[in-house]
């Protein structure tokens, strides 16, 4: 009788339940995996066989066929190692079939049977709960991520041997319990506005932008503080709600950029890619599309320094995501949509040498060169940037003065109040 274990695939930002069927067939001993598996899934044959033996269990001397259904969904990554191994163990008679009822299983296996980190645990856990599963076996280091989903029993698995002992009733594994220590340091620590001398009009413009969710373009000579001001922007944005935090964490989990020990991102992202980035790196892409920088900046700030130095194609592909707050990527293997509700902060020099209009250093660019440099940014893209502001050089007296500026916390309070008023206004429209 075939063994049936349930696992999960991630397609875009959503999970898809995968039924792992394991059965014997006639032929020489070995294992065949069908159901549109990629190379990593095909390689699980060797990992599973060695891990089962190293767990002290007998591996059947039969020809084993593993079917991953639905066959129309491409299966990628090593997350199917653990469910395949569990299916083999059940098929061999080491465990009854009922031990995996209402259970979702994911995890990569090492040759010694240790269960390794798997990306995309959060959307998998959300899919498990949405489909009525009561329990989920996950790698021990990913348990905090899965535990963010309520009403789902999360069992942290350290090794295949431990999982077998748990299901056999020999040594039970306690369900994971979330604690306050799960909320660790933020991914990015913004600069405090109180540490920035001068530029009061720019600070005010950024406050208005934060209150209204506007995109900003700062133009100024080198050393005027554009980067410092941009890095302070996340500090005045309102704190994320739990729904927004889960939304952001889901993207980082799928992109495998969630730091170890940080199951939930509570602070707004700040992404600052280099101007040599490709358009696929910025908006997402690849043969099997993955989130790009604009999706990793979802609910946060995307800072593009040296704005005109980005490739024309790279900048132009941002126009649709800036309007729709999502990016749709079409490939031969399918079309995926990623969230991209970011706030753009762009910075640029006024000319190629950087000192056009500077109060101290003269510009060496010809008028035609200045015009050509500024036209690297197309009109349609500039139309999507609501606030354009000049950032002049700060004079020595302000830099050396003792006056402390207003803190980010105080500004954030006004920004939050403005957004609350907007919510009330929209409710009465």
Task: Report each predicted region and the residues it spans.
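Walker B catalytic acidic pair
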Residues: 299, 305-307, 317
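Walker A/P-loop
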Residues: 217-260, 324
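P-loop NTPase nucleotide-binding/switch module
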Residues: 170-208, 212, 239-294
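Peripheral, non-AAA+ core regions of ATP-driven protein-machinery
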Residues: 1-217, 221-227, 330
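Basic, amphipathic alpha-helical bundle interface domains used for macromolecular binding and assembly
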Residues: 34, 40-45, 58-60, 67-77, ...
């Amino acid at each position: 009788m075939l063994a049936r274990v349930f696992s999960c695939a991630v397609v875009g930002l959503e999970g898809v339940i995968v039924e792992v069927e394991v059965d014997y067939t006639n032929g020489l001993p070995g294992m065949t995996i069908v159901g549109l598996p990629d190379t990593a899934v095909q390689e699980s044959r060797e990992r599973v066989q060695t891990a089962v033996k190293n767990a002290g269990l007998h591996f059947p001397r039969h020809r084993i066929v593993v079917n991953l259904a639905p066959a129309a969904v491409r299966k990628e990554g090593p997350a199917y190692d653990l469910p395949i191994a569990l299916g083999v163990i059940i098929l061999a008679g080491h465990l009854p079939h009922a031990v995996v009822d209402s259970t979702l299983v994911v995890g990569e296996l090492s040759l010694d049977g240790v269960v390794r980190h798997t990306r995309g645990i959060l959307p998998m856990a959300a899919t498990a709960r949405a489909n009525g599963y009561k329990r989920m076996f996950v790698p021990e280091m990913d348990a905090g991520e899965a535990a963010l989903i309520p009403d789902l029993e999360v069992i942290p698995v350290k090794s295949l041997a431990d999982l077998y002992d748990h299901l056999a009733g020999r040594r039970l594994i306690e369900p994971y319990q979330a604690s306050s220590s799960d909320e660790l340091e933020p991914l990015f620590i913004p600069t405090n506005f109180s540490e920035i001398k001068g530029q009061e009009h720019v600070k005010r413009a950024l406050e208005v932008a934060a209150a209204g969710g506007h995109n900003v373009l700062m133009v100024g000579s080198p050393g005027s503080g554009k980067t410092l001001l941009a890095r302070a922007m996340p500090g005045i944005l309102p704190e994320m709600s739990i729904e927004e935090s889960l939304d952001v964490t889901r993207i980082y989990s799928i992109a495998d950029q969630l730091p170890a020990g940080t199951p939930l991102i509570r602070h707004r992202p700040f992404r600052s890619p280099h101007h040599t980035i490709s358009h696929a790196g910025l908006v997402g892409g690849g043969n099997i599309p993955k989130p790009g920088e604009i999706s990793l900046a979802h609910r946060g700030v995307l800072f593009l320094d040296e704005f005109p130095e980005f490739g024309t194609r790279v900048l132009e592909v941002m126009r649709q995501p800036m309007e729709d707050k999502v990016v749709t990527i079409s490939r031969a293997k399918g079309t995926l949509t990623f969230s991209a509700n970011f706030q753009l902060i762009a910075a640029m020099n006024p000319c190629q040498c950087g000192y056009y209009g500077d109060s101290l250093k003269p510009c060496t660019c010809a008028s035609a060169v200045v015009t050509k440099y500024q036209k690297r940014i197309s009109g349609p893209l500039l139309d999507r940037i609501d606030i354009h502001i000049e950032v002049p050089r700060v004079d020595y007296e302000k830099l050396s003065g003792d006056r402390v500026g207003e803190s980010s916390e105080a500004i954030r309070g006004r920004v939050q109040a403005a957004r609350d008023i907007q919510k009330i206004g929209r409710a009465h429209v």
